[in-house]
UniProtKB/Swiss-Prot annotation:
Binds 1 [2Fe-2S] cluster per subunit. Binds 2 [4Fe-4S] clusters per subunit. Core subunit of the mitochondrial membrane respiratory chain NADH dehydrogenase (Complex I) which catalyzes electron transfer from NADH through the respiratory chain, using ubiquinone as an electron acceptor. Essential for catalysing the entry and efficient transfer of electrons within complex I. Plays a key role in the assembly and stability of complex I and participates in the association of complex I with ubiquinol-cytochrome reductase complex (Complex III) to form supercomplexes. It is a peripheral membrane protein. InterPro entries: 2Fe-2S_ferredoxin-like_sf (IPR036010), 2Fe-2S_ferredoxin-type (IPR001041), Mopterin_OxRdtase (IPR006656), Mopterin_OxRdtase_4Fe-4S_dom (IPR006963), NADH_UbQ_OxRdtase_75kDa_su_CS (IPR000283), NADH_UbQ_OxRdtase_ferredoxin (IPR054351), NADH_UbQ_OxRdtase_Gsu (IPR010228), NADH_UbQ_OxRdtase_Gsu_4Fe4S-bd (IPR019574). Residues 30-108 form the 2Fe-2S ferredoxin-type domain. The gene is NDUFS1. CDD domains: fer2, MopB_Res-Cmplx1_Nad11. GO terms for biological process: mitochondrial electron transport, NADH to ubiquinone; mitochondrial respiratory chain complex I assembly. This is NADH-ubiquinone oxidoreductase 75 kDa subunit, mitochondrial. It comes from Bos taurus (Bovine). Residues 1-23 form a transit peptide.
Length: 727
């Protein structure tokens, strides 16, 4: 069953979306021949005229058509002539027929496009000099290429009242050409039916009908797909032109998905963040936190080293003084008297440098803020803590069981993949945990973790659904593993996954077991041998503690001896810095070339877009300098040498943009039998239940005024956020 209209689903197929609809193997053998301006091309039945033209490299103008959305056919800019046909046809919506000769540059085609463009420009305001879309506007480009050189319109232009849909998207609806891309994105990709049209003909308007915030974690993507300047970025308004900015390809670290992004900078400042195409991860979308939290990069920053004086106050100092103090304390302790905690935004290079430094003083107490059970297989088997099916792999699944997670806010782009498969492939989804709005229908099996034992034993009705599935996925949220019975939950999920693999029709290379992480540094830290959670530090408090970007509040001053010497190294004055005796300012992800590993085990690199503010430096360089002053010099001086060291410890960390398949599920299941199987009666409640919990989850987003406005708008309404009254 298709959950979108059949005609729209078939006509809207493109290279990027064909894989998500199951087709018969005979389709490829039934190719038909058509001609584009006399040039022969072989295409599959159902291919549209527009797709056939693109196959031979002929670009057809369009406004409403988008490769990842259903076909609307309402802008008519893609009109082309078919030889011997009485009228021009809309190329985006018309399937080709055998023997057709498509004329893309005939006089009839040119006249039709010119007429459509004239109608579109009739009511369009001459805002180009003050429009934020200027320089990357489809209407500008296509009016130059396909429009007339003069206007015949003398009547008054219509004006439309702007809509307030929140603090992120700025609307100037007089510029709207009713292409409905934003409406289709909202309903099909984001799964939120907040946008629609009212009125008809000249009175048609796009909006929310009643004034309200556009309640979606993916709302910023409508800015990218809007072909005109009707929808632009509020935080970016009137700040820069696209040709003034320098573009740097990088990745996002706001969650564990690792979305590919482009960082636009000017004069050493991040001006905006845009999505970058990566079919296996984020396609061409990014979350609102990824897109709009960049203003947090210039607020609450640590720009100079600081030390705590005799009065207990933190004061500025030099790098030499700060590092000398830390080195002196480091030389005073040995073994587990020295410990470290790594936060959620730390890169792999800093993790290996800190590990090597503490190993020099015979300490192996290196912990992460996130807990992951070490009982049973624990972190010894890499497949035990990865999203093994991969992010794109969910499009092949036929059943998904979500356990203790809300992927909509923990991993928005992964949730969009699930919705895509649910929409096109008849994917069946079930959830164990608190009921949440996932933007697609699912079976709520309850919120008790004991349901896992019923499914494993076969006594639960959903057990049969899993047994009959050909490609099932069990996805366990990392938030569920923070509980006291996290080990038992992991063991139960591992047991279910292994039983499905061995007793149903699952193919040998299909991976059932999946862990969905929430933070960017966790997989790399586990790969490098960090201990998940701070239990070891709480049981045996150290005399010296390194907090490497640790702002999760997992440990407080009260948990440590009064004389414990705390060093905080990071880029924001958030939770960790105020309790430190020495603060070492580090670089944020836009200010360094660094390695991060996403939840599926894919290593990727951030790139230097701007220089760190003030005296801040890259984390691994700070640790390397500290080691030299302390007389225990680490054996690397360059970034390449650090990455060679990464390769020695864990080769996966330098196999960039590659996912290595792991298949140790049977061993993990056997080892899980050694775990205490006792489950608590407490319900599984993910920490991010609503969109209000999505916006401020790390030191960067908590420093962002834009994210604070989003929380206020969600809580009090879009009208509660005052915006400057300019254009």
């Amino acid at each position: 069953m298709l959950r979108i209209p059949v005609r729209k689903a078939l006509v809207g197929l493109s290279k990027s979306s064909k894989g998500c609809v199951r087709t018969t193997a005979t389709a490829a053998s039934n190719l038909i021949e058509v001609f584009v301006d006399g040039q022969s091309v072989m295409v599959e039945p159902g291919t549209t005229v527009l797709q056939a033209c693109e196959k031979v490299g002929m670009q057809i103008p369009r406004f409403c058509y988008h490769e990842r959305l259903s076909v609307a056919g309402n802008c008519r800019m893609c009109l082309v002539e078919i030889e011997k046909a009485p009228k021009v046809v809309a190329a985006c919506a018309m399937p080709v027929m055998k023997g057709w000769n498509i004329l893309t540059n005939s006089e009839k085609t040119k006249k039709a496009r010119e007429g459509v463009m004239e109608f579109l420009l009739a009511n369009h305001p001459l805002d180009c000099p003050i429009c934020d879309q200027g320089g990357e506007c489809d209407l500008q480009d296509q009016s130059m290429m396909f429009g007339s050189d003069r206007s015949r319109f003398l009547e008054g232009k219509r004006a439309v009242e702007d809509k307030n849909i929140g603090p992120l998207v700025k609307t100037i609806m007089t510029r709207c050409i009713q292409c409905t891309r934003c409406i289709r994105f909202a309903s099909e990709i984001a799964g939120v039916d907040d946008l629609g049209t009212t009125g008809r003909g000249n009175d048609m308007q796009v909006g929310t009908y009643i004034e309200k915030m556009f309640m979606s974690e993916l709302s910023g993507n409508i800015i990218d797909i809007c072909p005109v300047g009707a929808l632009t970025s509020k935080p970016y308004a009137f700040t820069a032109r696209p040709w003034e900015t320098r573009k740097t390809e990088s990745i996002d670290v706001m969650d564990a998905v690792g979305s590919n992004i482009v960082v636009s900078t000017r004069t050493g400042e991040v001006m905006r963040i845009l999505p970058r195409m990566h079919e296996d991860i984020n396609e061409e979308w990014i979350s609102d936190k990824t897109r709009f939290a960049y203003d947090g990069l210039k607020r609450q920053r640590l720009t100079e080293p600081m030390v705590r004086n005799e009065k207990g106050l933190l004061t500025h100092t030099t790098w030499e003084d700060a590092l000398s103090r830390v080195a002196g304390m480091l030389q005073s302790f040995q073994g587990n008297d020295v410990a470290a905690i790594a936060g959620g935004l730390v890169d792999a290079e800093a993790l290996i440098a800190l590990k090597d430094l503490l190993n020099r003083v015979d300490s192996d107490t290196l912990c992460t803020e996130e807990v992951f059970p070490t009982a049973g297989a624990g972190t010894d088997l890499r497949s035990n803590y990865l999203l093994n099916t991969t992010i794109a792999g969910v499009e092949e699944a036929d059943v998904v069981l979500l356990v203790g997670t809300n992927p909509r806010f923990e991993a928005p782009l992964f949730n969009a993949r699930i919705r895509k498969s649910w929409l096109h492939n008849d994917l069946k989804v079930a959830l164990i945990g608190s009921p949440v709005d996932l933007t697609y229908r699912y079976d709520h099996l309850g919120d008790s973790p004991k349901i896992l034992q019923d499914i494993a034993s076969g006594s639960h009705p959903f057990s049969q659904v899993l047994q009959e599935a050909k490609k099932p996925m069990v996805i366990l949220g990392s938030s569920a593993l923070q509980r006291n019975d996290g080990a038992a939950i992991l063991a139960a999920v591992s047991n279910i996954a292994q039983k499905i693999r061995t007793s149903s029709g699952v193919t040998g290379d299909w991976k059932v077991m999946n862990i969905l992480h929430r933070i960017a540094s966790q997989v790399a830290a586990l790969d490098l041998g960090y201990k998940p959670g701070v239990e070891a530090i709480q049981k045996n408090p150290p005399k010296m503690l390194f907090l490497l970007g640790a702002d999760g509040g997992c440990i407080t001053r009260q948990d440590l001896p009064k004389d414990c010497f705390i060093v905080y190294q990071g880029h924001h004055g958030d939770v960790g810095a105020p309790i430190a005796d020495v603060i070492l300012p580090g670089a944020a992800y836009t200010e360094k070339s660094a390695t991060y590993v996403n939840t599926e085990g894919r290593a990727q690199q951030t790139k230097v877009a701007v220089t760190p503010p003030g005296l801040a430096r890259e984390d691994w360089k700070i640790i390397r300098a500290l080691s030299e002053i302390a007389g225990m010099t680490l054996p690397y001086d360059t970034l390449d040498q650090v990455r060679n060291r990464l390769e020695e410890v864990s080769p996966n960390l330098v196999r960039y943009d590659d996912v290595e398949g792991a298949n140790y599920f049977q061993q993990a299941s056997e080892l899980s039998k050694l775990v205490n199987q006792q489950l608590l009666a407490d319900p599984l409640v993910p920490p991010q239940l609503t969109i209000k919990d999505f916006y401020m989850t790390d030191s960067i987003s908590r420093a962002s005024q834009t994210m604070a406005k989003c929380v206020k708008a969600v809580t009090e309404g879009a009208h509660a956020v005052e915006e400057p009254s300019i254009c």
